[in-house]
């Protein structure tokens, strides 16, 4: 695959994610930042809720009432783990927003 085709494919993939995040936030999705409390204190998406990754599994009952959840962290790795945990516990409408800075650009 040529570099041009690869870039085109990546743009299509990321564009659809961006549109989804923007719309989810407009529709009132709850943003969960899974970084540590110290990391959260250094900067976060306004209105986001800090639930460190280690506490996600025990926070399921608090999160079930939310219509849609966007997880975020520093790079997208921990938020991906949080997404898998939440989905394994029965929550269906969960999206990994990646880094908190990525989510913040749509807020």
Regions found by a protein language model. Name each.
Residues 73:
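Short cysteine clusters
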């Amino acid at each position: 695959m040529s570099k041009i085709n690869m870039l085109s494919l990546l743009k299509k993939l990321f564009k659809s994610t961006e549109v989804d995040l923007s719309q989810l936030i407009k529709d009132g999705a709850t943003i969960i930042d899974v970084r540590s409390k110290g990391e959260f204190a250094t900067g976060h998406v306004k209105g986001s809720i800090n639930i460190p990754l280690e506490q996600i599994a025990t926070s399921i009952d608090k999160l079930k009432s939310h219509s849609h959840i966007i997880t975020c962290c520093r790079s997208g790795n921990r938020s991906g783990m949080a997404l898998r945990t939440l989905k394994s516990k029965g929550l269906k409408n969960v999206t990994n927003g990646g880094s908190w800075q990525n989510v913040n650009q749509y807020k």
